[in-house]
A protein has these predicted regions:
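Catalytic core of pol beta-like nucleotidyltransferases
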Residues: 1-16, 20, 32-38, 48-230
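A structural signal for short, well-ordered beta-strand segments
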Residues: 43-45
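Short, glycine- and small/hydrophobic-rich beta-strand elements in well-ordered beta-sheets
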Residues: 21-28
Length: 230
């Protein structure tokens, strides 16, 4: 199983290619201490970089972690990222470099939560428009990846409500249950891993999409009124 050592190697190679005149900051968007399964590594960020310097270094990681989103940016481009991504990186673990990131802000949290829920629902509802279901592994992985926006919105919500951003969905479900958000807690507690979701999507795609559209819609109905008061 791929592990975090690969990302350490990536950071070393990229830093060497960038040279001493560039700062490198690579982060785990999941904020996991030691992500082992591929689906625990969600984002890799390189800041103050020239893109062609790190293309070769990141290619190997892309091959092993096909669902990772890569960001190769300069500082100004980082500041212009949507709140959803800035908020994830505010909690991520630094691998290399000492570039200061903006602190987590409540306004960013609200924007991130709204974007996470709306993006997820839009993606799920777009699947209903398909004339033919693309029953393929790549399609299933992409749908599952898009659903991760809901997962992150849920973690962001925990921070907004309790000042704690949990590293696992089990803890998130407990926090939401304690806040009386039953639908949101039930939805995130059933968060599927990649292998399970891909199998279900390839065997019963319509049933899977309908089920998650219903769950995320119910969760958003609970959550949305809270955001207007924050």
């Amino acid at each position: 199983m791929p592990n975090a050592d690969l990302i350490e190697q990536l950071a070393t190679v990229a830093a060497r290619r960038l040279g001493g005149n560039m700062r490198l900051l690579a982060l785990y968007g999941s904020a996991a201490e030691n992500p082992l399964p591929a689906h625990d590594l969600d984002f890799l960020l390189v800041v103050d970089a020239v893109e062609n310097c790190v293309t070769q270094a990141t290619q190997k990681c892309r091959d092993i972690y096909p669902n990772v989103q890569f960001f190769v940016l300069n500082t100004d481009e980082y500041r212009a990222l949507p709140a959803f991504y800035r908020f994830q990186f505010a909690f991520a673990r630094c691998l290399r470099g000492d570039l200061d990131l903006p602190p987590a802000l409540r306004a960013d949290a609200v924007d991130s939560i709204l974007q996470g829920y709306t993006d997820t629902l839009r993606t799920l509802r777009q699947q209903f428009k398909r004339r033919k279901w693309a029953i393929a592994d790549d399609w299933a992985r992409q749908v599952w990846w898009d659903l991760k926006s809901f997962k992150y919105a849920t973690l962001d919500l925990c921070w907004l409500l309790r000042g704690e951003r949990p590293q696992d969905v089990g803890r998130a479900a407990l926090i939401l249950q304690g806040q009386g958000l039953t639908a949101a807690a039930e939805a995130v507690s059933e968060w599927p891993n990649l292998e399970t979701a891909a199998t279900q999507l390839k065997t019963e795609p319509l049933r899977w999409v309908l089920r998650w559209e219903k769950r995320v819609s119910a969760a958003f109905a609970e959550v949305r009124p809270l955001l207007s008061s924050k």
